[in-house]
Amino acid sequence: MTTLASSYDPSSFESRLYAQWEAAGYFVPSDTGEPYTVLLPPPNVTGTLHMGHAFQQTLMDALVRYHRMRGYDTLWQVGTDHAGIATEMVVSRNLALEGKGETRDSLGREGFIAKVWEWKAASGDTIERQMRRLGTSSDWSRSTFTMDPQPSAAVNEAFVRWYEQGLIYRGQRLVNWDPVLKTAISDLEVENVEEDGFLWSIRYPLADGVTYEHIEHDADGNETLRETRDYLVVATTRPETMLGDTAVMVHPEDARYLTLHTARIVLPLTGRHVPVITDDYVDRAFGTGVVKVTPAHDFNDYQVGERHNLPLVNLFTADAKIIDPRKQYPDDESPFVNAGIDWRELDQIQRKRLGQHLAYKIPAQYIGLDRYDARKLVLSELEDLSILVETKPHKLQVPRGDRTGQVIEPYLTDQWFVKMDALAKRGLELVESGQIQFVPPNWINTYRHWMENIQDWCISRQLWWGHRIPAWFDDAGHCHVGHDEAEVRAKHGLGAEIALHQDSDVLETWFSSQLWPFSTLGWPDSQAMAERGFARYLPSSVLVTGFDIIFFWVARMIMATDSFTGQVPFRDVYITGLIRDAQGQKMSKSKGNVLDPLDIIDGISIEDLVAKRTNGLMQPRMAEKIEKATRKEFPDGIIAHGADALRFTIAALATHGRDIKFDLGRAEGYKNFCNKLWNATRFVLMNTEGARFTGVPQPRTEAEKWILARLDKVTAETHAHYANYRFDLLAQSLYEFAWNAFCDWFVELAKPALNNQDTDAAASTRHTLLYVLESLLRLLHPLTPFVTEELWQQVVPRLGITTATISLQRFPQVGDVDTSGYATAEADVEWLKSMVSALRRVRSELNVPPSKQVRLLLQADTADERPRVARFASQLSFLLKLERIDWLDAGQDTPPSAAAIVGELTLLVPLEGLVDMDAERMRLDKEIKRVKGEIGKCNGKLGNATFVQNAPAVVVDQERARLADWTTQLAGLREQRGKL
């Protein structure tokens, strides 16, 4: 007797099975067979699993399990990232919540870092526990943390090598600066948000008595104004930065300003003279065609400043207040700038000193003001001077830090950079030569665009948590780079009497992440490389990641791996879309639409779900709105679906598009799919009690041959879909075979044989049921590992299989069963299915009870179908509850019947005795009258021009859809009435 539970309850076995798998070491690389390696994009160590993680990890796990079952030596390299900024914020927030008065600054660097390690120890394995719950089949003994000793050594080695090769340098450049965190951040950490702002137009007086003829025209080209002006009008969205202007620019071909190419203007509020320059960057059609240039506070202006050798005036402190130049640059009130030197002839040192000197021209009343307070004062003083021409509303793209929400400042600081030109050229060659394949291939265009427009990479961050930059400075400011201080002293002959201090900055996390493909394999330590299989597992087989980090991570891994190892990091890059909610909105805490994958797996009450979505909001005022929306969408919370239902849902949604809408209803449907598989297995087990088989079935019935042929085809489709990373088509193929072919049809078609006195047919059918079910479980296992393992353990003893786990059982192959002679059987069973479907449809339309036997009459122009009907008569009678099957001769009168057509056959079901003819006619006539009335209402509305023209388009479309539905219903009712 089967010991399989009577109902599908994933909570009763999923955690148990995972613990068994891990304890048995099934996920450890085998060291035999062809290597297959997958890299996990390392999530933040203090983070939790979100839908994006679950989506990509499900696909990775399916690939790993599939290849493990095919005999590959699989390594799924997992681990976590130290996530500098995110982790510092989490720990700082927790210090505040503890209420002990401890802060980052009060603890100091060493004390704070100790707190971070404490936090990592307490909560750092949360995400790994969650990954286990999802079914991640990785060797956890190889899990790597980017701050572990081995990866940290790799970071130092990479920095030193690139520095010695001249690829890493320290310089003053413009970076994205978060004035709250007081650190540079990457482009990926900046969100451009459309906001309402203003565009201010300001008069900049021309210097040296210069004037020009200003002419304006209307839309038809007619002159509307001509006057002599001694000023230029400049429009800006950031008037406070005018204090740092070092030029204004016009287009070289703009006829309005041809006479001003050598002019200067007097910068309002400061009295400084700055040049008018010409540059093709200017859009002549925007505003007045005159643009202020502030190289130290705008990325585009910075590029202009580089082209024209303009000085850079840094206005702000690290927390976005106006600097006090006498404190910032105490030695740089330099007299050389008054000696008549042309700014275009300055070298870099002179240019820097000039920028610092010009900061002394900032009016005293601005020093120490916050940037927005400075803006107010600038506007007030411009208005007092009557040179604020216009203020008008303007839509702005405001750069905000994704963690603090603060406006990011383009900020001039000394940072460490990597020269990217040569690295990018090589990285592009590796992809375009085909050594690395992108899937879908259109993402190569995105990769190419980024690589061809690359800029030097700012790798330093003003944080404490992270890999500290291996550079030491002496008191004279000389920089020395090495693996440690001892090496620096030995290499440069620096005695103990020379004081050295290490750079306080750390490397941004992408620097260590770019080394992930080979630092996890022991590089650069030769012994560790041998132990961890560097030569065997690099390059990895595939990287599964999102399109949003193609440049920030994928490209950098390609460049770094080639630079340090001479190899590519991976063969394939499978780019997934981004998970959004069912309405296509980005999932975010602030919108209150985040779905926790573990809540889908294990379920959550509505109260707990509301608490999870409303606690810790950056905008607490949104809590009420989020709670209301959550209670409306999930009035009873979220039911438990189990990991397999979530995984299958993810696979089914994994199209090759940019955005993927996650619909929880799909998960409910795939939970039903798992339940269907469970019940089908119970049927098979109950009907094969005591049976023992080995080898491949020798089918005796057409139904067996049909299902074996279908199994061979779905096996071929499965391999093809894995090869092409089409998880959506994979899920569709397996679903169709499991639900329709096996559960709905073969289980039904097997019943006549199982209940037949032909013992050979019954035995072969039992064998085929077990064989196909076992093969199906293996086909499904990479996507739904838990339910397939639980069912497989019940099935395989009856097939003589002794392998301990389905995860190590050989994956089905095309040709496991020779189906070359099964074409006729396939055609016959497809015909049988059509017959059964047609007759069941008739019974349903006539509301004939399932247990009621009916008579079937058949008509055909030829006798060709008679032998096939005779062969399948017993199956038809069993499946359709047929009293008898009779043939009508040509011209023979037919009784009142319901009819259906299958090929050349007409199927007739006599109505006498099945329905009350008079009552059924009355019912249908009444229903037809009602539907006609509804159609009349729709036609009345749609025939009313006022309604069609004035009603919202969506309302009109709904009315048209209703008309189509009613019309379809009427046709069906009339057809039924005609049969009576």
Curated annotation (Swiss-Prot):
Function field: Catalyzes the attachment of valine to tRNA(Val). As ValRS can inadvertently accommodate and process structurally similar amino acids such as threonine, to avoid such errors, it has a 'posttransfer' editing activity that hydrolyzes mischarged Thr-tRNA(Val) in a tRNA-dependent manner.
Question: Where is motif 'HIGH' region found?
Answer: 43-53
Which major enzyme category is it?
ligase
User: Which gene is annotated as encoding this protein in its UniProt record?
Assistant: valS
Residues annotated as binding ATP: K589
| Keyword Magnesium part of the UniProt annotation | no
Name the chemical reaction catalysed here.
tRNA(Val) + L-valine + ATP = L-valyl-tRNA(Val) + AMP + diphosphate
| UniProt protein name | Valine--tRNA ligase
The top of its lineage is:
Bacteria, Pseudomonadati, Pseudomonadota, Gammaproteobacteria, Lysobacterales
> Where is this protein found?
Cytoplasm
NCBIfam families per record: PRK05729.1, valS
**Pfam families for the chain:** Anticodon_1, tRNA-synt_1, Val_tRNA-synt_C
The residues forming a coiled coil are 914-980
**Membrane-spanning intervals of the chain:** none
InterPro entries named in the record: aa-tRNA-synth_I_CS, aa-tRNA-synth_Ia, Anticodon_Ia_Val, M/V/L/I-tRNA-synth_anticd-bd, Rossmann-like_a/b/a_fold, tRNA-bd_arm, tRNAsynth_Ia_anticodon-bd, Val-tRNA_synth_C_sf
